[in-house]
Amino acid sequence: MTMIKIDQYFEPASWQKFTKAAEGRETPFLVVDLSRIETKYHEMVSLFPNAKLHYAMKASPAVEVINLLANLGSNFDCASIYELDRVLGCGVDPSRISYGNTIKKAEHVKYAFEKGIDLYATDSEADLKNIAKHAPGSKIFVRILVQGSETAEWPLSRKFGCHPNMAIDLLVQARELGLVPYGISFHVGSQQKDVAAWDDALSKVKYMFDWMKNEEGIKLQMINLGGGFPTNYISEVNPIKVYAEEITSYLTDDYNDDEMPEIILEPGRSLVGGSGVLVSDVVLISRKSDTDLTRWVYTDVGLFQGLIETLGEAIKYPVYTPKMETSTSEGTVVLAGPTCDSTDIMYEEAGYQLPEELEIGDKIYWLTTGAYTNSYSSVEFNGFPPLEVVYID
């Protein structure tokens, strides 16, 4: 994997903002440029003008991010009552919030309903009955299993969702339980590169919409397309415009203007991923034998300080050090974290290249780390504190 150049990811003025914010701070820490989130939000709204954006809070649940998106008009998808409390604490009206986790305690459903939440995801009879009991009259959408894990870097359709036939049964049962069978949701997998994955999922949804209307007399009103839109890591991805055009085409092929259901998107990674740069120091450089050609580069950030998505080398972050700009020689490295856990290795098989001139104390910048880093950072594993975050705009 060849070394990168910083101008592949940032304009000079934008990169200068990050480096200025990093001056004089003890590593590791994450720098988040809120203006980049705002720009991305406006882009998504313009490309999906008829959709409601429900920001997937799990990507970065920081108050600074919530306040920004709330002021821009975003809705929010919560995965827990703890995220719910945070977004409500920012003054967001409950009508702008969905409870999108299909796995939730009965008492948490009750709590959310008491706070004004009336839109819930489900994928099982037990959860559906909990919603009926503790959030009577609420709108529910059933999450279905779809294809796409083969082309997603972070698959999400095993733990969540049910077979479309079961989803139909749940929607019928929802009506019998006094709930509103509102719609269907799916997720094609995070960092999904194949736009055709949405076409396959939407075909299943169209069949279910027609079945529910013709066989059960239930007119579903909403499709939740989830997230999955990719951001720029090591591998090149199509711009979001390509996804928007194709998905819009799929929808208009399936539904007339007067039949078009409400569309919900749950962007997370695609909204905030490009806003972050994680700054770390090189702690140690070593080799495992005198003849080993591969250097082990240990940094003061690892899986437990925010880089958990490198598990299995799934997400491949762009890794940058200023010496890349002048280096005349590079070599393959293993990148590992600082903890006393043998799994704390970010990249061993990917073949990352770093300058031979790299030294202990040099800075390493992990680009495109605005999503699923600070929210995953552990609390004091091996005594290391949670990842510090610096916000700029």
Residue ranges and their predicted role:
Residues 58-62, 79-82, 102-104, 123-125, ...:
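Active-site beta-loop-alpha junctions enriched in small/polar residues
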Residues 129, 149, 373:
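Short glycine-rich, flexible loops that bind phosphorylated cofactors or substrates
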Residues 1-138, 176, 180, 214, ...:
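A charged N-terminal "starter" segment
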Residues 148-286, 346, 382-384:
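Active-site loop/helix belt of alpha/beta enzymes
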Residues 52-54, 75, 94-98, 119, ...:
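Structural preference for beta-strand elements that scaffold enzyme active sites
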Residues 246, 252, 258-393:
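Charged (often Lys/Glu-rich) extended helix/loop segments that serve as interaction or gating elements
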Residues 68-69, 91-93, 113-114, 134-137, ...:
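Short, glycine/charged-enriched secondary-structure capping and boundary segments
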Residues 40-42, 63-67, 193, 273-275, ...:
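Short, solvent-exposed polar/charged micro-motifs at secondary-structure junctions
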